[in-house]
Design a protein with these regions (language model features):
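Acidic, metal-coordinating catalytic segment for phosphate/diphosphate chemistry
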Residues: 16-60, 74
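Acidic/glycine-rich phosphate/pyrophosphate-binding loops and surrounding catalytic core
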Residues: 110, 115, 121-123
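Conserved Nudix-box catalytic region and its N-terminal flanking loop in Nudix hydrolases
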Residues: 42-45, 54, 62-101, 143, ...
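Active-site-adjacent beta-strand/loop module that shapes the phosphate/pyrophosphate-binding cleft
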Residues: 27-34, 123-145
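Short loop segments at secondary-structure junctions
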Residues: 31-32, 57-60, 69, 137-141, ...
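Conserved hydrophobic "DFG−1" position in protein kinase catalytic cores
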Residues: 55, 65, 135-136, 161
Length: 196
């Protein structure tokens, strides 16, 4: 099903903050489904694109996950040390180059392949970030470094080896509550036989 391209005209834009992310306020006109022009004011966070990857070891039927501190989660009162798939910002790299770099930095695994699965907007109502999702079949021999993140980026990342079925249970019991991680684990559960 194809969607008509939005008919939008930006009337004005104002930068509200320009730190790690940029926050802008927009006044816009758009033509709705009935053909009427609507004037709206919206704020948008301009966020660098990112990539994430599920590292799956079919011989041991496990996934490589990471645990790291997330301030935004802490601010909401949830456990701040989140269990996630390896991920990172593109930093002007192609998504596959970026995720290969991030997998090595965070987990110490050298990827023989990185298969692109899909891309999505995790919060399209207010954030421009697009995330590219990948999967890679790995083996214990592919771990060529310790991982754990980069000292100069003050990363403190724990590398976890989790059986896939246990990871599914961790979603059910609330231990894993990161959206990109849940999406990739559910994809792996649906496609496990194709990965073996």
């Amino acid at each position: 099903m194809t969607q008509p391209k939005s008919r939008v005209k930006i009337v004005s834009a104002e930068t509200l903050s320009n730190g790690w992310t940029k926050l802008s306020s927009y006044l816009l006109d758009y033509i709705d489904r009935k053909g009427a022009t609507q004037r709206l004011k919206r704020e948008v966070y301009h966020r660098t694109p990112a990539a994430c990857i599920l590292l799956y070891d079919p011989r041991r039927d496990l996934v490589i996950l990471v645990r790291q501190f997330r301030l935004a989660v802490h601010m909401n009162g949830d456990p701040a040390w989140m269990i996630e798939v390896p991920a990172g910002l593109l930093d002007d790299d192609h998504p596959e180059q970026a995720i290969r770099r991030e997998a090595m930095e965070e987990t110490g695994y050298h990827l023989r392949d990185a298969r692109f699965l899909f891309k999505c907007y995790p919060s399209p109502g207010a954030i421009t970030e697009v995330v590219h999702f990948f999967v890679s079949v790995i083996d214990i021999a592919d771990r060529v470094a310790e991982g754990g993140g980069l000292d100069e980026e003050h990363e403190d990342i724990e590398v976890l080896e989790v059986p896939l079925d246990e990871a599914a249970q961790m979603i059910e019991n609330g231990e894993i509550f990161d959206a990109k991680t849940i999406m990739l684990l559910q994809w792996a559960l649906l496609n496990r036989n194709k990965l073996r």
